[in-house]
């Protein structure tokens, strides 16, 4: 674990440019730390098991698997049955976290699955940048990643959620990510998909309050034997909501890169605007 951290430069990054770091190997969280000055702002950053059984349990239970219920699809049901690990973040009202939090997930076991759950709540007027990194060694048998991410962005709050996925080419990456954005709030998805044998990944933004905004920026690189099926979903469910979807894909050596986007505008979403570019 220490060697992997050193190769990734995480110890140096934690000291210089990260507000907190979490790490998960296979099904277990092995490290979690947050800077004292960030903790003093009231920011909570801990592993999911501790959050569910600690002083924040009521808040966690109110939000856990509410955006992605087990009935959503078969991999959500599998996740709900066997999940382990992941991160819980809460940013209090009006707090701006100046430097990012980061979680790193590594699936090290041969022929195994990883089912971490990430839950982030950014309260009214707060601001956070969260970075997620994923990797795994290469084996000659399939591995499965079916994690879940639930993001709650309060009134006039902002969350940037950045992901770099560099799984090995024996990985089936079937992650589900969803954000609920209230009035005047903003969710920014930044996604880089470079690894795995097969990926199906479509982060979803539900714009539930007047003036809520979603922006998705994605880059996909599919090489030999890779099938990367990615994109973004947006639901405009309130007036004057706006969304931008901007993606670029590269394929080489027979790799397959597929882009899918879905933008839904409900009857409540008067004067909604959306732009999709790929």
Please report, for each region that a protein language model flagged, where it lies by residue.
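Conserved beta-strand/loop scaffold segments within soluble protein domains that form the structured core
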Residues: 3, 7, 11-12, 25-278
């Amino acid at each position: 674990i220490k060697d992997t951290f050193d190769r990734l430069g995480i110890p140096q990054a934690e000291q210089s440019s990260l507000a907190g770091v979490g790490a998960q190997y296979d099904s277990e969280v092995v490290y979690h730390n947050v800077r004292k000055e960030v903790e003093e702002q009231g920011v909570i950053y801990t592993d999911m098991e501790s959050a569910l059984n600690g002083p924040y349990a009521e808040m966690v239970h109110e939000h856990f698997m509410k955006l992605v219920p087990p009935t959503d699809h078969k991999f959500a049901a599998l996740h709900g049955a066997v999940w382990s690990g992941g991160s819980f973040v809460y940013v209090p009202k009006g707090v701006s976290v100046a430097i990012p939090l980061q979680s790193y997930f590594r699936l090290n076991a041969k022929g195994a699955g990883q089912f971490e759950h990430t839950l982030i709540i950014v309260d009214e007027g707060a601001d956070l940048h969260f970075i997620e990194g994923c990797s795994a060694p290469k084996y000659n048998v399939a591995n499965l990643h079916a994690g879940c991410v639930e993001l709650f962005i309060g009134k006039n709050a902002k969350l940037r959620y950045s992901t770099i996925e560099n799984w090995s080419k024996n990985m089936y990456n079937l992650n589900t990510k969803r954000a609920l954005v209230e009035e005047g709030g903003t969710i920014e998805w930044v996604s880089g998909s470079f690894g795995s044998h097969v990926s199906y990944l479509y982060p979803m933004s539900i714009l539930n309050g007047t003036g809520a905004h979603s922006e998705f920026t994605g880059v996909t690189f599919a090489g030999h034997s890779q099938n990367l099926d990615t994109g973004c979903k947006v639901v405009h469910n309130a007036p004057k909501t706006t969304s931008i979807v901007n993606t670029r894909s590269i394929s080489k050596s027979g790799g397959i890169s597929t882009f899918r986007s879905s933008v839904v505008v409900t009857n409540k979403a008067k004067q909604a605007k959306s732009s999709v570019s790929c």
